[in-house]
C-alpha cells in the first residue's frame, strides 16, 4: 500500500501544480482517480483522466501543460494524438510514472461541478471541476462494456451505493451483467485485490458484485412491470 499511497501523493501534487498555473479551469476531471480523490472511492487509481470544459486550442493547451509539468517533473513521454493529449512523467528515475490523458472533447454542458480533491497523503486540497456522479455512472457503464476491466465494475457498485440512479437501457443492462458474470477468481484476487483497501478484499472475494447485479436486474424487472 505504501507504493500506492506515494503515487496518490504524486497525483495530488500534479493537480496542485496545474491549479497553480491556472490550467485546471480548462478541464473536467473524470475517471477512477477523480472518484478516489473527490468522493473517497475505496480503491487506488494510477492515471489522471480529463476532458475539456470549453472549446480550447488543443495544441496551445498541450504546450502549456508540458511546460507546467516539466518545471516539477521529468517528462518521459508526450504525444498529441487524434483523440487525446497524452503525457507521462515521473518525479525521479526509478519511481512510478504518472500518466495523464486529456481527451479532445468538450464535456456536455450541465455534466460537471466543482469539488475539492483531497488525500490524507498530501498536505494541500485542490479545487477542481469534475463530472457529476450521474455522468460518471454513464461513463463507467460505457467503459465496462467496452473494455471489461474489473475496476470499472467496482466503481459502478460504488456509485450505486452512493445513491446514483442506474438509468440504463435494456441492452446496456444485459451487456453489463454479461461482463459481471465473466469475471474469474483471479480477477478478484489479483486485479481488484491489489488496488482496493485491505478490509474490502475478503468481502469481494466472497460476494463479488452481487449487489450491483441484483440492483441492475431489479431495475430491469421493475421497468418492465
Predicted feature locations:
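Structured mid-to-C-terminal alpha-helical surface segments
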Residues: 1-27, 38-41, 53-225
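Short cationic amphipathic helices and targeting signals
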Residues: 49-51
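Glycine-rich beta-strand-to-loop/alpha-helix junction loops that act as flexible
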Residues: 29-33
Amino acid at each position: 500500500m505504501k507504493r500506492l499511497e506515494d503515487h496518490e501523493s504524486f497525483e495530488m501534487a500534479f493537480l496542485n501544480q496545474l491549479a497553480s498555473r491556472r490550467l485546471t479551469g480548462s478541464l473536467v476531471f473524470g475517471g477512477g482517480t477523480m472518484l478516489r480523490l473527490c468522493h473517497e472511492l475505496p480503491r487506488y487509481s494510477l492515471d489522471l483522466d480529463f476532458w475539456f470544459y470549453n472549446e480550447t486550442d488543443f495544441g496551445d493547451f498541450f504546450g502549456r501543460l508540458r511546460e507546467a509539468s516539466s518545471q516539477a517533473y521529468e517528462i518521459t513521454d508526450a504525444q498529441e494524438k487524434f483523440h487525446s493529449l497524452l503525457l507521462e512523467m515521473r518525479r525521479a528515475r526509478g519511481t512510478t510514472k504518472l500518466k495523464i490523458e486529456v481527451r479532445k472533447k468538450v464535456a456536455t454542458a450541465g455534466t460537471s461541478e466543482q469539488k475539492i480533491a483531497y488525500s490524507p497523503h498530501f498536505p494541500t486540497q485542490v479545487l477542481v471541476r469534475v463530472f457529476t456522479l450521474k455522468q460518471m455512472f454513464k461513463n463507467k457503464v460505457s467503459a465496462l462494456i467496452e473494455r471489461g476491466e474489473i475496476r470499472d465494475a467496482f466503481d459502478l457498485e460504488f456509485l450505486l451505493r452512493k445513491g446514483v440512479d442506474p438509468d440504463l437501457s435494456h441492452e446496456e443492462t444485459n451487456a453489463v451483467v454479461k461482463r459481471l458474470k465473466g469475471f474469474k477468481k483471479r480477477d478478484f484476487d489479483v486485479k481488484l485485490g491489489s488496488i482496493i483497501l485491505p478490509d474490502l478484499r475478503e468481502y469481494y472475494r466472497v460476494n463479488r458484485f452481487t449487489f450491483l447485479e441484483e440492483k441492475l436486474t431489479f431495475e430491469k424487472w421493475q421497468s418492465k412491470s
